């Protein structure tokens, strides 16, 4: 059975003091949970504060982006080696905001995934269609294209050990979440692509999250779907009570 993974994507929120306060409120709520892996992905400036606060806990640290370059004259960029040095185990790559606002292509995302793996980081590879693509019936084709580009050059074992996050662009930060049954259909199709390209074992092992307006009140419905293995949580992860409730729902779903 795949262990659920719930990751907090704080985006461009929280100073170091705010991050420390979040942990002070969240960690006591997390302490009794089992059967779920939890990751917090703060902005770069709060990585050190969060890393310190997570010492001795089961909660993992992740980053929200990284360069595909190992080092050099790349102003403003952060390498995989730097993330490892900061204590990161995970890194979010290919988020729709990176693709849409900063022009990251499928090829760039794939290069970042390969670079992350070279540094021992676990990529959380984000894929997802826009509203226009969904309405045109192109969702599965878009997800397939983004997925195969992001996984290009990887071995079945590497694919089995990373995380995929299906985030329909039209559901991110809009309050309009994808129907759990529809999310299951999209994610089952993604898993089928993995099976086709990398084999049934990789497809059975890889964890696939849902993301897009995830809240405490809808998390259980997503976790009831057989192919959904957790969530990549945006806005609701900024509140420790809300995020703890989402994590608890994931843990309870797998305990049944």
UniProtKB/Swiss-Prot annotation:
Keywords: Cytoplasm, Gluconeogenesis, Glycolysis, Isomerase. GO terms for molecular function: triose-phosphate isomerase activity. Substrate binds at residues 9-11, 173, 213, 234-235. Its EC number is 5.3.1.1. The keyword Transport does not apply. One of its GO terms (biological process) is glyceraldehyde-3-phosphate biosynthetic process. One of its GO terms (cellular component) is cytosol. SUPFAM superfamilies: Triosephosphate isomerase (TIM). The keyword Transport does not apply. InterPro entries: Aldolase_TIM, TIM_sf, TrioseP_Isoase_bac/euk, Triosephosphate_isomerase, Triosephosphate_isomerase_AS. It is found in: Cytoplasm. The active site is at residues 95, 167. Pathway: Carbohydrate biosynthesis; gluconeogenesis; Carbohydrate degradation; glycolysis; D-glyceraldehyde 3-phosphate from glycerone phosphate: step 1/1. Involved in the gluconeogenesis. Catalyzes stereospecifically the conversion of dihydroxyacetone phosphate (DHAP) to D-glyceraldehyde-3-phosphate (G3P). Homodimer. Belongs to the triosephosphate isomerase family. This is Triosephosphate isomerase.
């Amino acid at each position: 059975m795949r262990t659920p993974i719930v990751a907090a994507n704080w985006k461009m929120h929280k100073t170091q003091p705010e991050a420390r306060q979040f942990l002070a409120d969240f960690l006591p709520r997390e302490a009794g949970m089992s059967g779920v892996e939890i990751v917090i992905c703060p902005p770069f400036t709060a990585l050190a504060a969060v890393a310190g606060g997570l010492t001795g806990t089961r909660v993992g640290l992740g980053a929200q982006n990284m360069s595909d370059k190992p080092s050099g004259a790349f102003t403003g960029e952060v390498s995989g080696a730097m993330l490892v040095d900061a204590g990161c185990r995970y890194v979010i790559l290919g988020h729709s905001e990176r693709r849409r606002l900063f022009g990251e292509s499928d090829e760039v995302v794939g290069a970042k995934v390969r670079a992350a793996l070279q540094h021992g980081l676990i990529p959380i590879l984000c894929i997802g269609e826009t509203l226009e693509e969904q309405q045109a019936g192109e969702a599965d084709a878009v997800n397939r294209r983004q997925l195969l580009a992001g996984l290009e050059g990887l071995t079945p074992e590497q694919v089995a050990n990373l995380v995929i996050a299906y985030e329909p662009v039209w559901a991110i930060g809009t309050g309009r979440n994808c129907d759990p049954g529809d999310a299951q259909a999209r994610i089952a199709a993604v898993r089928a692509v993995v099976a086709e390209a990398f084999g049934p074992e990789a497809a059975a092992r890889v964890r696939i999250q849902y993301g897009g307006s995830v809240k405490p009140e809808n998390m259980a419905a997503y976790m009831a779907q057989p192919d959904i293995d957790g969530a990549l949580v945006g806005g609701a992860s900024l509140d420790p009570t809300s995020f703890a409730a989402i994590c608890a729902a994931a843990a309870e779903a797998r305990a049944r």
